Amino acid sequence: MLTTDSDPIVAIATAPGRGGIGVVRISFGRAGEAAAQPLMQALTGQTLAARRASYVPFLDASGDALDRGIALYFPAPHSYTGEHVLELQGHGGPVVLQLVLQRCIDAGRAFGLRLAEPGEFTRRAFLNDKLDLAQAEAVADLIEASTEAAARSAGRSLDGAFSRDIHALVEDVITLRMLVEATLDFPEEEIDFLEAADARGKLARIRERLGHVLSEARQGALLREGLSVVLAGQPNVGKSSLLNALAGAELAIVTPIAGTTRDKVAQTIQIEGIPLHVIDTAGLRDTEDEVEKIGIARTWNEIERADVVLHLLDARTGMTVEDEAIAGRFPAGVPVVRVLNKTDLTGLAPATRALDADLDLSEVRLSAKQGDGVALLREELLRIAGWQAGAESVYLARERHLIALRAAEEHLATAAAHADQNSQALDLFAEELRLAQDQLNSITGEFSSDDLLGVIFSRFCIGK
């Protein structure tokens, strides 16, 4: 069946499973009030007042009540989607919700009512200018938030904080483009428009503001995605003990027998609101045990995908030949923290130090068993992540936002280089400003392909 963005659509808007309340939502698309009024009459036996809660029966085709609950009618454009919307809020049992949903589809078949696709209600809100693209993505991020900090940041994006900063940057770039275009269009004038309007100073200020927005977006991306942290090292160096210490719970089995962990144990923990996906892995060593070999192979697969590797060492022996061989296989470009564990058996005090800034290699001494120095490791992980403690204005951001912001930053840097050249480079200056503007507009959806929209909204749940 060929679907369009103007079809009437319906879906269950609440999460699957049993609950006190279940919501069925209809957005009437191009059919509008011509479909809304007769469908309300068929489903509730009443004509509903706009934006007023009515306690009504939800009727089947014979006029018998399937359920009773609250019906809300939102005429366009004052609704979530910007279209005429009807919500039936009844009991949250899966059977009764499916009955009400099917009744809606049957009653609305004459108007082309169909089941909504994932994210289609929010897509309509975007297409009808109720939300821009960054705000629409924030709806999904708010639903999926795994920490309080992520939820609050998603809320800021939904309220438009991120979008307002992007729109302000776009307006500044447009103003600067106008100055450049004026200079190009009137070359015979003696006035230097760029010099008179302090164009270079304006560009510098735009780049400074963009840098601030990018910094906030990076923080938001951390809150959304978190970090993948892999515990690696020889058997019996305390990897499982460290996982338990970081999590504050007995998640992994700890014994003095080397090779106890044969497969990965994964746990997501929070540090200052950042989700850390910590993975305890099988000890790395030469072995003839076929099961253990499989676990070791999986360990290396996890290391290849890690954002950070915690290389655990026994503080009593330090870096051994075997540890050197393990470290030599770590992927380039991945930050590594050498964790000297079991300091309680050596008399060493917990401490942190940088080993190689260029390689992002550092060292933390701690005792996972006693908990001494674990706080230092948490601080080191925050440093590696680039987290700025106490950030209050963070908005949740996605990888595509960061890519667009970095691209805009590069175009503005190139524009600045052209601005310092002679007037023959002005057309290149103007072009780089245009490209920067396009990148910024792609964040809010001012310039977005249908393919991009399809990918974004397909990841929403049905009913949103």
UniProtKB/Swiss-Prot annotation:
Q: Where is the TrmE-type G domain?
A: 226-386
- Which Pfam families does the entry link to? MMR_HSR1, MnmE_helical, TrmE_N
* Keywords, ordered alphabetically: Cytoplasm, GTP-binding, Hydrolase, Magnesium, Metal-binding, Nucleotide-binding, Potassium, tRNA processing
Coiled-coil intervals, chain numbering = none
Q: Name one GO molecular function term.
A: GTPase activity
Q: Name one GO cellular component term.
A: cytosol
The family database entries (PANTHER family) matched by this protein are listed as: TRNA MODIFICATION GTPASE GTPBP3 (PTHR42714), TRNA MODIFICATION GTPASE GTPBP3, MITOCHONDRIAL (PTHR42714:SF2)
What is the protein name for this chain?
A: tRNA modification GTPase MnmE
Q: Which organism is it from?
A: Paraburkholderia xenovorans (strain LB400)
